[in-house]
Amino acid sequence: MIQATIRRSHDKGILSFEMTGHANFAEHGQDLVCAGVTAVVFGAVNAVIVLAGFEPLLDIGEDGGYFYFEFPESLDPEARQKAQLLIEGMIVSLETIERDYKDNLRVTTNII
């Protein structure tokens, strides 16, 4: 199962997110849940880089099964606002996948 953990501040702003595990919906290369989650996450992160104009802190597992995104502490408020909206859209998409594939994806939020 893919575990997606969203970390938010007390004011509900996104601080970071982490993805771990594998969907195990189908064989490697044929797993639609994995492909959907990967497309949503990489699409959102690429949009942040291009449209918000900054490089987030990223850690991507070499063999798959791990992805970490964190907002830099010093970030222009306008860029942060744009990126927050893009990542919120990613979360909506992940939760939509989770509704149909509960055994393969779990999205949780932690307030820190």
From Swiss-Prot:
<dbReference type="InterPro" id="IPR036764">
    <property type="entry name" value="Peptidase_Prp_sf"/>
</dbReference>
<keyword id="KW-0788">Thiol protease</keyword>
<comment type="subunit">
    <text>Homodimer.</text>
</comment>
<dbReference type="InterPro" id="IPR007422">
    <property type="entry name" value="Peptidase_Prp"/>
</dbReference>
<comment type="function">
    <text>An essential cysteine protease that cleaves the N-terminus from ribosomal protein bL27.</text>
</comment>
<feature type="active site" description="Nucleophile">
    <location>
        <position position="34"/>
    </location>
</feature>
<keyword id="KW-0645">Protease</keyword>
<comment type="similarity">
    <text>Belongs to the Prp family.</text>
</comment>
<dbReference type="GO" id="GO:0008234">
    <property type="term" value="F:cysteine-type peptidase activity"/>
</dbReference>
<protein>
    <recommendedName>
        <fullName>Ribosomal processing cysteine protease Prp</fullName>
        <ecNumber>3.4.22.-</ecNumber>
    </recommendedName>
</protein>
<dbReference type="GO" id="GO:0042254">
    <property type="term" value="P:ribosome biogenesis"/>
</dbReference>
<dbReference type="Pfam" id="PF04327">
    <property type="entry name" value="Peptidase_Prp"/>
</dbReference>
<feature type="active site" description="Proton donor">
    <location>
        <position position="22"/>
    </location>
</feature>
<keyword id="KW-0690">Ribosome biogenesis</keyword>
<dbReference type="GO" id="GO:0006508">
    <property type="term" value="P:proteolysis"/>
</dbReference>
<keyword id="KW-0378">Hydrolase</keyword>
